[in-house]
Curated annotation (Swiss-Prot):
PROSITE patterns linked to this entry: HELICASE_ATP_BIND_1 (PS51192), HELICASE_CTER (PS51194)
Record's keyword annotation contains Transit peptide: yes
Keyword terms: ATP-binding, Helicase, Hydrolase, Mitochondrion, Nucleotide-binding, RNA-binding, Transit peptide
Cell compartment(s), UniProt: Mitochondrion matrix
Subunit note: MSU1 and SUV3 are the two components of the mitochondrial degradosome (mtEXO).
Gene Ontology molecular functions: ATP binding; ATP hydrolysis activity; RNA binding; RNA helicase activity
Protein name, UniProt field: ATP-dependent RNA helicase SUV3, mitochondrial
Catalytic reactions on record: ATP + H2O = ADP + phosphate + H(+)
Membership in a protein family: Belongs to the helicase family.
Function as written in the Swiss-Prot or TrEMBL entry: Required for intron-independent turnover and processing of mitochondrial RNA. It is a key control element in nuclear-mitochondrial interactions.
Amino acid sequence: MALVKYSTVFFPLRSLRLFVSIKKAYYHSEPHSIDLFHDKDWIVKRPKFLNLPKNEHSKLDIFQFNFNKSESNNVYLQDSSFKDNLDKAMQFIYNDKLSSLDAKQVPIKNLAWLKLRDYIYQQLKDPKLQAKTYVPSVSEIIHPSSPGNLISLLINCNKISNLVWKSVLKYSLSNNITTLDKFIHVLQQTFDHVYEQEILPMMTNTDDTDGAHNVDITNPAEWFPEARKIRRHIIMHIGPTNSGKTYRALQKLKSVDRGYYAGPLRLLAREVYDRFHAEKIRCNLLTGEEVIRDLDDRGNSAGLTSGTVEMVPINQKFDVVVLDEIQMMSDGDRGWAWTNALLGVVSKEVHLCGEKSVLPLVKSIVKMTGDKLTINEYERLGKLSVEEKPIKDGIKGLRKGDCVVAFSKKKILDLKLKIEKDTNLKVAVIYGSLPPETRVQQAALFNNGEYDIMVASDAIGMGLNLSIDRVVFTTNMKYNGEELMEMTSSQIKQIGGRAGRFKSRSASGGVPQGFITSFESKVLKSVRKAIEAPVEYLKTAVTWPTDEICAQLMTQFPPGTPTSVLLQTISDELEKSSDNLFTLSDLKSKLKVIGLFEHMEDIPFFDKLKLSNAPVKDMPMVTKAFTKFCETIAKRHTRGLLSYRLPFNLLDYNCIPNESYSLEVYESLYNIITLYFWLSNRYPNYFIDMESAKDLKYFCEMIIFEKLDRLKKNPYAHKPFGSTRGHLSSSRRRLRT
């Protein structure tokens, strides 16, 4: 085959065109897909071995580690027990991972072996290795994901109790467990990590990747082979708001040994977690930002877990999984999480709670998967009425128990200030960028009667218990990110249905009733039409390939392909071949996040996929902080949140009355802190000192609450939405002095 030299790499002549396409796509403002699925002769890009002795590059069956006299000050040479265990474990790994391979697998696994040894040499040569102060977490023991911390993990593996180790290794309580057993487990897992995340993504598309490309990318049901091995029972609980759907599903969940509640918000996951514990039912909590394991005296986790839908362990076996708000599977941004969970959870029963609009879509999916389907329909527990006329006298016509709905922070805070100025009513507020804890506080003040009126966005549509008598729509239009659009009947029903939902029975003993109205006749007419409209059935489920499938597909791309190009190409290929049942998740927000770290070459491909799902709010202060966090991952540093140059000096009680520090600054700080928690759960070796982070989070929540309570003027009245640049730069100047 003819070869063309490009820099120091030789490419097949017929592949040069695609290489140039990649270079163009990489530097273009918008990532372009490239036609790679039919051109697969790529040259392997070998990993670099900067610390491995040259004589070991070709000779593989070496299990010991060799150092010169100047490098003798390391644990391997000074601790004979450590040396003996490491040598024996390395020999075991070699025999287990390399000796029994067929000829096609050998070259790739050899590279993983050499890279593993290179990591070990690098750390043993490091005089600044802070191994003795390092305390590994249980998650690091189970699935080590940071080869750069391997030696520290081995040195400190005995800090994890043997009971936990026996659970990890599936030893019986009567069996003894040795340090060598622990070394072997950690090294096996680290070898697999290096092989799958660092070596495979650089390989050619050949048969030596264990059938990685056999997955049918055009059929999402086949992405989850474990779920296809069993015939699951899908049980639907469908009905309007306040019909008891989720309650019935949770009753079933309580009765089993292994189960998962998957909610749309961490606020809801926490609510179920707290409810179970109040009923003396053991339960774990699993959200992107918070993980709480309910352990018994022997270190065994509870069988039930409450969490967010994105965190569902797809391949873990369950008796019951509850997917709440299943109609969210059509959401362009997050719908993939519901769709993938429905297709992929390995559970005897899968309970789906949601609106009737999703029924035909679920029927089609269940027909595709071959599962059994049972449908339970429920009616609303209370009455819901649309008032005949709009409210007289505008704001002065509001009464205690009303919830006024608006769709921007500026409008919501304008309404709060105007209502409190023109009436004697006290106003609580809820909108999407408020911390969940603050939303709970505001809801509690409204529910217990301390505050009279609630002014809120569509954030009240799910996740909060609110004792609303009447929902008052200020408009029937909502900005969708690109243009102002009329709200769908489903959206109006979801919000309007909150009226009367958590009210007790009326004084006369009748069924509790909720009301819907508006300030304007035109809006009220539109709302009534939507409430009375027939069900709008959802037509497509939003999906996206798992990180594992994306990684398998990456082996079909040449080395150095930007992550954004890979994702765009997958999206385009699926759109071409997929039927109308599934559609692809909107890439805009994902690509915007990827753009913050894509240039960082030291972040492995798998980590880039993981980071593309980070909850990064589109606020200048937040995106800058996330970029700094990604640099920490790229450099494999260990840092606490306070070590970053961020304006945490504003988390001071004296700043509360200072109106130059707006709510938005504190909302940005809060999002940075929760982003740090999200990263710490995935990179516990890099992001540490969670106690300080928890304190900062608490202070931030407190100040936001106080800022709302003392609000005298709207901080969004005279500046573009989302701008925190002025506050950030002035705060940084203070931090430098």
